């Protein structure tokens, strides 16, 4: 089983399939959309088969490993593998992208180009989670941005060029830090290598780690996103189509969280111990600032975009908790938000197709004409506000308890952070339920409610939301369904991070001010 190049096949299948789209005879786009859906389903089936047949849940290290020399002159290798960090996100990518392809059914403008770019994104996103060569990681990270930019700039709204340009400038600017920090890691010391495992084993001075950590944090903070590097996201979501929404919220934001885990925590553990309080503070700012900003938004897309930023704050706090429970909760929050964010933004697209407005002031009373849509909006919003029995509740609870019980911070710091996290949790249902009240209940916009195009959701849309709600509820009632995949890897990562805390005080001779939030290690470090 392990001798077959599963990951390479999974990455290349949608990319190679995309190359055949230009020669498919198709005038109205119907053939090419069925072709793209078939490719997505086959690739997702391969992901599931490779997972069940060749992935050992008890093994924390890399599996399904492949390594082929690509450019021997610079020792660049096509090196891919999957562990507990990458496998859940590879599965999520296949699942969300396949549903996003179904969500793209209404696209009639240049359908061949659209589905061509969708398949390129599919392969590129999986590659980001699978590659184990840091230079190759940078290349696929950059190449994956091109389809996103084109989809935003061609199929977006009135300000699509502004949003697409802002997206590419932010992300490309951040990528420069990936390149500089990655090359520094590769060429530091006696051994020059791009292999991530070999880089993680290097003995890198703490001061250099701090500099590289800051560079990676800026780059991945753009994609997560982290305040104040977040401003591209509301603009991008404000102009994107439904399938682009699903990919942005469901997958692209997770690339930032994954990279923070893989590189900042995994490769630079000493620096992570110093930056951890900073991550906690940034996480709290994300939660509170974005929640208040979301509450003030009148544009439906921007309201949910800021909600996404708020939820990503829990990821940062979980990563900095130094506990198995907290970091596991951060990973679960990424997966949970991928599902919930995709469902909410799909509903935004479905609603806009009928109302042709995004302003909440103009949407009153549409629930009476969209009975099934009413139920779907309610279910997705309840999932987003972390209703017990849904995945968001479990993820946020794990982060809460994991951070509250962390022995890496003093009691005062933990108490303040937990209280502020609680404020964010309270704000979430306020702005989400008020959104539902304005949009679905009233006061009625008679012109809109009586419009002939305001029809209920169709079976295709019900199916897409149903597919997203099944894992949301399934994880909510049985979190082990997902946590068992990544817990061995997360536990190993946490132990590495915890062991690094005392080494900072001894090796870097940091001042008390720099470690004021971190107290000396106790038993278990």
Swiss-Prot record:
UniProt keyword ATP-binding, yes or no: no
EC class: translocase
InterPro entries xref list: NADH_Q_OxRdtase_chain4, NADH_Q_OxRdtase_chainM/4, NADH_UbQ_OxRdtase, ND/Mrp_TM
Xref: Pfam families: Proton_antipo_M
GO cellular component: plasma membrane-derived thylakoid membrane
TM spans (from-to): 4-24, 37-57, 89-109, 111-131, 134-154, 167-187, 210-230, 241-261, 273-293, 309-329, 330-350, 385-405, 416-436, 462-482
Keywords on record: Membrane, NAD, NADP, Plastoquinone, Quinone, Thylakoid, Translocase, Transmembrane, Transmembrane helix
Record keyword Transferase present: no
Places the protein is found: Cellular thylakoid membrane
GO biological process, one term: ATP synthesis coupled electron transport
Enzyme Commission designation: 7.1.1.-
Membrane-related topology note: Multi-pass membrane protein
UniProt catalytic activity: a plastoquinone + NADH + (n+1) H(+)(in) = a plastoquinol + NAD(+) + n H(+)(out); a plastoquinone + NADPH + (n+1) H(+)(in) = a plastoquinol + NADP(+) + n H(+)(out)
HAMAP family (alphabetical): NDH1_NuoM
This protein's name: NAD(P)H-quinone oxidoreductase chain 4-1
Organism: Synechocystis sp. (strain ATCC 27184 / PCC 6803 / Kazusa)
